[in-house]
Design a protein with these regions (language model features):
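Fungal secretory targeting signals
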Residues: 1-20
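Structured soluble/peripheral alpha/beta segments that form catalytic or ligand/cofactor-binding pockets
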Residues: 21-352
Length: 352
């Protein structure tokens, strides 16, 4: 999802699916059905539709929580990053039943339309299917490891990060907004090569759009996307550490009913009892559990369901941990159990 520092390169890195212990829990992936994406009562600093155009560059990113017509559940990640100097596509697939995992990263030439959302790197990309660049969008990946073709609709109220949609990010600023629960259909190809149809009544996509006025990024960050079942709450939680700029930020943007937004400080503590050693760098060890307190809102104990959920590249630009997580916690004094994603980005010096 994230806006990363540009680096030169041409590479394709992938791993085949891996077997793991079967995970029997099922999840409620019902999409929202909002009538409008953004009413405009809160004055954000950009037009959502305009930022979709290829000329804006930056990051186009989705996580899709899907249920097939055979009642199998998958977690899909898809990401196009475009900067003046480099472009990449990466994707992953996690079977939430048996925890089979596959991923790839491809750095190469981007073809795009300056005035609309139409981005392609190799056989993968994002494409607007509506004139407004927003109402209906396609994400597709044709790699042998991760193959899917998804259509997602803007049936959800937007979430502009930090309330206005813009915040400090390294030495510059970044803008970021999300459509957190889009109706989704299409198909994916399973590990055995069989094609599976997605049930749109039991599937949704979080679409995240980000760019900025400075290509530099913080040294490290951990970002969480959390969904609170049986409520309208969607959380985007940033924890940013950048020693060069002295930026150590922890904040959550909470979207509730309608355009209800809260921007709240966060207490963040990674737990290194369980860890995963990066495939990309011997200097990177990922924690697999975290304790978070969102001030005035709730507390969460978050855990990755599978240790190896790393998208493996050859640099910090290409590599990220994009893991499906579950959590237990309390919101409004009530016990909650939910799911989401953790994204972990490590600084370039770990690859040198």
């Amino acid at each position: 999802m994230k806006f990363l520092a540009p680096m030169l390169g041409l590479a394709a890195v992938f791993t085949p699916f891996a077997q793991a212990t079967r995970h029997t829990q099922s999840y409620s992936f019902e999409p929202e059905n909002a009538k409008t994406v953004w009413k405009g009562d809160i004055p954000i600093l950009f037009n959502l539709n305009e930022t979709q155009a290829g000329s804006w560059g930056g990051s186009y990113w989705i996580t899709s929580y899907v249920t097939t017509t055979e009642n199998e559940q998958y977690f899909l990640v898809s990401h196009v990053l475009t900067t003046p100097s480099v472009s990449l596509f990466r994707a992953s697939r996690l079977n939430l039943g048996n925890l089979e995992y596959a991923q790839f990263v491809e750095v190469g030439n981007l073809t795009s339309d300056r005035d609309s959302l139409d981005l392609k790197i190799g056989q993968h990309g994002f494409q607007a299917l509506s004139d407004d660049n927003l109402s209906k969008t396609r994400a597709f990946s044709k790699h042998k490891n991760v193959n899917f073709d998804l259509t997602y609709e803007a049936t959800t109220q937007a979430l502009p990060n930090a309330g206005s949609g813009r915040f400090q990010f390294g030495p510059g600023t970044t803008w970021e907004w999300a459509l957190p629960s889009c109706k989704t259909d299409g198909h994916l190809v399973k590990a055995n090569g069989a094609k599976a149809t997605i049930d749109p009544k039991k599937s949704f996509t979080w679409y995240d759009r980000q760019g900025g006025d400075n290509p530099q990024t913080p040294g490290n960050w951990t970002w969480f996307q959390l969904h609170v079942p049986s409520t309208s709450y969607k959380l985007s939680i940033w924890t940013i550490d950048d020693e060069k700029t002295g930026q150590f930020n922890r904040f959550a943007t909470v979207r509730g009913d309608g355009e209800e937004l809260q921007v709240l400080p966060v207490t963040f503590k990674p737990d290194y009892t369980r860890t995963f050693q990066s495939h990309a760098s011997s200097k990177i060890v990922y924690p697999l559990d975290w304790d978070l307190v969102v001030a005035g809102f709730g507390s969460f104990r978050i855990s990755s369901v599978k240790a190896d959920q790393e998208m493996v590249g050859t640099s910090s630009l290409e590599t990220a941990y994009e893991g499906f997580v579950t959590y237990t916690g309390r919101v409004g004094g009530k016990k909650v159990d939910g799911f989401g994603i953790v994204e972990i980005f490590s600084k370039q010096s770990y690859f040198e």
